[in-house]
Amino acid sequence: MDATRFASSPVGRLVPLRGTDGRTGQPYDHVAFVPDPLPNEPPLAGATWRAVSRASHALGRLHQAARQVPAPALLRRPTLRREAQSTSALEGTFAPLEDVLAADLMDESARSADLREVLNYVDTADAAFGWLREGRRVTIGMLCELQSLLVHGTPADTPQAGHVREIPVAIGGRSDSIVDARFVPAPPGPELGAGLQDLVDWINSSGRAGRDPVVAAALVHYQFETLHPFNDGNGRLGRLLIVLQLLQDGVLTDSLLGVSPWFESRRAEYQDRLAAVSADGDWDGWIRFFADGLRASATDTAQRVHALLDVQADYLARVRAAGIAGIARDLAESLIAYPYVTVSAVAERTGKTFQAANNAVRRLVELGILRERTGRTHWRFFAAADVVAALIGPISAKEDW
């Protein structure tokens, strides 16, 4: 870390960091950055407030769109898996979205290590959203539980999993060395624990303090990333925290929003903007960038939700026109959540016989709704290509829908 760049930071301070690097075995005498407690709201330029307003408007439209969805659980599944794939990719864990969507059909032994790690994020986010619905607030204990779920079964699943870290960590750089790192967060110990407690208290006072929710989410994400309180999973948890805070503050009522695809496509600027806050106190540049990301993400999510609902309506119209009801109709309705199916999976999910499920799948194939992907006679694999395209493909750039 370039200590000279952060030496005069107006939002934090450098502290000594000495020890022996456990990865390289080399002693180091370096510094780490400890952020100050968050301000209530930093002064922002007019252009930044306009970006914040546009983000708030887009979030409001997503909120309204979610309220109009008759079965939101069907949409939570694909949108969360899309977010899981993208937020993991930002951290160097890659699994094709098609595999993430079809993972329930695979034997666990057939899943790659990367795919298992992406699915950990799905479980982690599901738990977090469920806890908020139960009325739990964000606490250090909750964050520790979430981190433990996130790293379960991975190399980071050590005795330290689920605990605030007790070792130094380094972010980026040419090697694993702390000295070569792009950024070195706060060292372990009382200051890190106090900083995390201050952040949690700030999150839970945000609504009462009358802070703008978009600005608050930007500040919280910066602070969490800068503290880096865990040995692993900080980036993914930090992006999950954006959605958790918007839900806790009542800006959103459903967890459909995915923020990572936008940040993933701008990874270098994302990292640079965070660093510029620590080095120069550039809240304005970070919050404007963040607000642009929230606006684009909310707009994209809402447009994909509408695209999925359009696909569902088209499927149901085809089924009605063919005079089909029962299990085939129910299957057509559920494809926006489960775009990859096998006959066995349909039978298990519906509680019907294998033959009934097979007949339903065959009828949807005849209608062009499902397509067989394997070319086999046993363990045939089917896909709803229109649903996959709505999740993966380009989406209209128009703002009004």
Stretches with model-predicted labels:
Residues 1-401:
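FIC/Doc superfamily catalytic core
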